[in-house]
Amino acid sequence: MSEQRHSDDELAGFEAERARLREEHLRPPGERPASTARGVHHTALISSDVETTIRFYQDLLGFPLTELIENRDYPGSSHFFFDIGNQNLLAFFDFPGLGVGPYAEVLGGLHHMAISVEPERWDAIVARLTEAGVDHVVHSEVSVYFQDPDGARIELIADPLGEMYGTQVL
């Protein structure tokens, strides 16, 4: 994404709009109200093959499978969960016979999911991705981007929770 797709005037306009939105909506940490949420319970993606997904997320990435049940809304479909730490789950559905197409980035859809990992585990995970032949890109020496077997983009980031590339975001 390094190629410039907008004129300098357009880029200046985008930055001016971000500045306006920050001024109008962003409050200093001490002035922000407490969130009404307590965390992400789970994010659910679609799997084309349950076993391939289990092998990728549990065996390669080290996220333990915690449950595998029938999808209550679609008989025959599986709903399964992986522990991604801090009492957060990554869930999947499969939809056998539904003919779900390949992953596509769409407006309102998932761009990527960033999962926090301990810095001391990050290098080992990157090494396992390399060893398994998974194409990946390392960014800022704390973040690695890759696609899962169904094309969903995943980022594993070793920055502290609430921080991104040295910037406090929480």
Residue ranges: model-predicted function:
Residues 85-90, 97-98, 120-122:
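Short, charged/polar surface micro-motifs in flexible loops or helix N-caps
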Residues 27-29, 67, 76, 97-102:
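A short, acidic/glycine-rich surface segment
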Residues 2-51, 110-113, 117, 166-170:
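N-terminal beta-strand motif that seeds the catalytic metal site of vicinal oxygen chelate
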Residues 46-89:
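Core segments of cupin and vicinal oxygen chelate
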Residues 97, 160-163:
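A short acidic/small-residue loop/turn micro-motif
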Residues 91-95, 99-116:
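Helix-adjacent hinge/juxtasegments
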Residues 49-51, 108-153, 158-161:
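Vicinal oxygen chelate
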